[in-house]
Amino acid sequence: MAAKDVVFGDSARSKMVEGVNILANAVKVTLGPKGRNVVLERSFGGPTVTKDGVSVAKEIELKDKLQNMGAQMVKEVASKTSDNAGDGTTTATVLAQSIVREGMKYVASGMNPMDLKRGIDKAVAAAVEELKKISKPCTTNKEIAQVGSISANSDSSIGDRIAEAMDKVGKEGVITVEDGKSLADELDVVEGMQFDRGYLSPYFINNPDKQVAVLDNPFVLLHDKKVSNIRDLLPVLEQVAKAGRPLLIIAEDVEGEALATLVVNNIRGILKTVAVKAPGFGDRRKAMLEDIAILTGGQVVAEETGLTLEKATLAELGQAKRIEVGKENTTIIDGAGEAVNIEARVKQVRAQIEEATSDYDREKLQERVAKLAGGVAVIKVGAATEVEMKEKKARVEDALHATRAAVEEGIVAGGGVALIRARTAIAGLTGANADQNAGIKIVLRAMEEPLRQIVTNGGEEASVVVAAVAAGKGNYGYNAATGEYVDMVEAGVVDPTKVTRTALQNAASVAGLLLTTDAAVAELPKEDAPMPGGMPGGMGGMGMDM
């Protein structure tokens, strides 16, 4: 085991605070509408230009072990805030730096760090309650667009795209972000349920222009096993043919003579059918087949339910208004399922989301909810160069997270104003002793810091603006983009409550840990081993005349 360096007291804390400051100073230049860019080196390809706080934080790794510990702790603040709320990473970093900086002064003057932390926690809890009180619900398209625009660094086109996407697929719908092919942003909306399986044979295509198979008013047969024997399918095919409607078969696989017969019937125009593989794998496949059954008002033909293909009737088949099957995707539009059953299924899947332990499972379950409840929207980000595309895509993803957070917990005035208002409301708070009161003071000072930084990045005098905003009431604040004092909500400068709340809580949590640290253990740097001696001599006789 390598030898360790153990550092105590102020020496440990001061080194860690140096690391905190290095990271926070690099991150905080990006805050606000007039924040600057940070350029990140890449081991291959061109550098990345970003205004995203968490992207900057993640790149920072310091040479000094103790400084690096401090930097990594604050990096945790940014990552946690990004994971929970999707935005507010720079605000969280600025708050953490301020709490650490102010707190260190009190610790150095001999105050009890544990009491300081209790005071900090008390003030944060009161501030969070106050933020919840002043929060207002975010329901209209205009408000959603405003949140998206602010989060995407005052880019209103991104906010409008996100609001449009949410309007089309609902608040629960899946919205994904992809690289576009043109200079302009585009929005593709898939209504109904789409899953990533296409036709099993190109002979099923009946729309050569789009290279898709379109079925109008079809029946849907769902089966959880492979189908290779056409005899199994004959009874149900005859019933569908009599009804004179097309058929979509979704099974684990359709192969051999079964697939060949379906293709021949399709080409001859005897029976319009398309076969696709069932989506997902294992238990997830069963669950998704069940979802499709509920959406189309059918039943999965499975041994577990006592059904076999030979005994299947039209009553067991699902129905839809229209189904499009492409090379890689199948879209079911307007399934015939009962709304009550679909709602019950959505509730059931939501309950599973609450209990899910892994992020992957949670993401897949959320996709299922969206497919059942609304649809899928894809925002295709357009840009002139790849570097710009990456930067813009990151901003769109941030804005998307922020709008979801706003819909969830509501919005407050942006630009650091909400924290100033919450600060005024808790200014009279007192702790159990003088040290706790000092902890409360630390938080009250830190809550000014985001506004100070926004103003500083805009090139104005921070103290003057903070005093003017603090003297105002309600949503009155400073719009750094225009340099005017306005009603922030009316001007469209809003933040999701969840983002502001999470930033404050995470910043206080990590800063409190730093202040109460009294020893740090780090590996000693390895000394470089001396180079081995000169090159060994050549073989005897080399280069000699024989």
From Swiss-Prot:
Enzyme class label: isomerase
Name of protein: Chaperonin GroEL 1
EC numbers = 5.6.1.7
Q: Does the keyword Isomerase apply?
A: yes
What is annotated about its quaternary structure and interactions? Forms a cylinder of 14 subunits composed of two heptameric rings stacked back-to-back. Interacts with the co-chaperonin GroES.
Tell me the Gene Ontology biological-process terms attached to this UniProt entry.
protein refolding
One GO molecular function term? unfolded protein binding
